[in-house]
């Protein structure tokens, strides 16, 4: 009965899940947060119960000790059932890491080097890896990269049309993100369709606060909407997605916004928040229903961008077997699904209203019977995918 511990670490917090791999059951999960602040906190769930605790947590090493204490106090026992592997989510693997990789000193140095491409994410992941190695010195640690799934993109999809020497010197290319989710969901879609993975053409729409689209052919990513960073592509909660780059030059010349201000503008003050003052899709929909014209426009922009990518990826794939919605908005918002695909019936893409309105946590069809293109809702499970990849990487 092998178990895998999955860790998703940031600069001041980390989440964890302990997963029994024979049945792929979550045995325990938790959150350690406010690391480095005067008072930190832990939350641990196991066996249907939950416990919370406040205590000083000086650093990630202390955070992992607090996690170990929670397992010792509330179970399940890590002494009786120690993990055979610990999987770490790492946002950016650049073009260095194309698959889940057992952590070595060289791997940690490479992750640190790639922090220039993901300064908000990779340093926290590295802190988590180092602390976890202290807590579990005799267990294999595996880094699973959000970007790895998209390393199969062809050159024409990942290359930006800028000076090639500058691009090479600064590692500028499309990397793509949410790869763990896109991989999990596209493989689940193939099973739901009853088709061999290598014969499928699937468009995955990962719609959460962050959002991305991917074209997956035969289980391999051939195009994706996020680029060098997670800023490109679809409209998101606070991120702009695609814009004309000259907008930044225009703002730099005609306002007092500096480089950091412009970066903050596009990452934290744009998207739905920038268009409406509201960053949550549910709030935007309520405002639109109440007649707010800005909210109505924002929803139109959001849907327009999704349709743009669905059409483009259908062309790149040479046809589509399924369009799949996943993540918080994609899984739970029937209105977004229906309106995002409205008008695509000429492509064989349509939604059955009754199926679409059904509230369920199960993977399911929301397209009519006999539809040329299946429309699916598949809950993502990035932690399980990380656990699967970690187990495979260690040979267990």
From Swiss-Prot:
Keywords, comma-separated and alphabetical: ATP-binding, Cytoplasm, Kinase, Magnesium, Metal-binding, Nucleotide-binding, Transferase
Subunit structure: Homodimer.
Homology family: Belongs to the acetokinase family.
Active site: 146 (proton donor/acceptor)
Pathway assignment: Metabolic intermediate biosynthesis; acetyl-CoA biosynthesis; acetyl-CoA from acetate: step 1/2
NCBIfam families found in the cross-reference section: ackA
Name the record gives this protein: Acetate kinase
Site note Transition state stabilizer, residues: 178, 239
């Amino acid at each position: 009965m092998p178990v895998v511990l999955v860790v998703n670490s940031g600069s001041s917090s980390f989440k964890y899940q302990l997963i029994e791999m024979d049945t792929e059951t979550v045995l325990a999960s938790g959150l350690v947060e406010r690391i480095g602040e005067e008072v930190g906190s832990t939350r641990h769930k196991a066996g249907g119960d939950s416990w919370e605790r406040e205590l000083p947590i000086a650093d990630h090493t202390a955070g992992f000790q607090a996690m170990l204490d929670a397992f010792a106090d509330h179970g399940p026992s890590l002494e009786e059932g120690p993990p055979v592997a610990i999987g770490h989510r790492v946002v950016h693997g650049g073009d260095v890491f194309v698959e889940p990789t057992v952590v070595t000193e060289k791997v940690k140095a490479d992750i640190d080097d790639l922090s220039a491409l993901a300064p908000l994410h990779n340093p926290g992941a590295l802190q988590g890896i180092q602390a976890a190695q202290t807590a579990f010195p005799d267990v294999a640690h595996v880094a699973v990269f959000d970007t790895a799934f998209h390393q199969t993109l062809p050159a024409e999809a990942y290359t930006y049309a800028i000076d090639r020497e500058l691009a090479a010197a600064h590692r500028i290319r499309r990397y793509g993100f949410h790869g763990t989710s896109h991989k999990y969901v596209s493989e689940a879609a193939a099973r739901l369709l009853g088709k061999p993975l290598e014969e499928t053409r699937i468009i995955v729409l990962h719609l959460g606060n962050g959002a991305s689209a991917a074209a997956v052919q035969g289980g391999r990513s051939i195009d994706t909407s996020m680029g060098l960073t997670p800023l490109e592509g679809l409209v998101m909660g606070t991120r702009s997605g695609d814009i004309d780059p000259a907008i930044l030059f225009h703002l730099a010349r005609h306002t007092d916004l500096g480089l950091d201000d412009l970066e903050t503008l596009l990452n934290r003050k744009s998207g739905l928040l920038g268009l409406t003052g509201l960053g949550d899709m549910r709030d935007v929909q309520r405002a639109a229903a109440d007649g707010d014209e800005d909210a109505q426009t924002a929803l139109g922009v959001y849907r327009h961008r999704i349709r743009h990518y669905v059409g483009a990826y259908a062309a790149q794939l040479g046809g589509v077997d399924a369009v799949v919605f996943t993540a918080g908005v994609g899984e739970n918002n029937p209105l977004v699904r229906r309106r995002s695909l409205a008008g695509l019936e000429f492509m064989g893409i349509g939604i059955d209203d009754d199926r679409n309105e059904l509230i369920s946590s199960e993977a399911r069809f929301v397209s009519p019977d006999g539809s040329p293109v299946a429309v699916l809702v598949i809950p993502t499970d990035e932690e399980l995918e990380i656990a699967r990849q970690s187990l495979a990487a260690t040979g267990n």
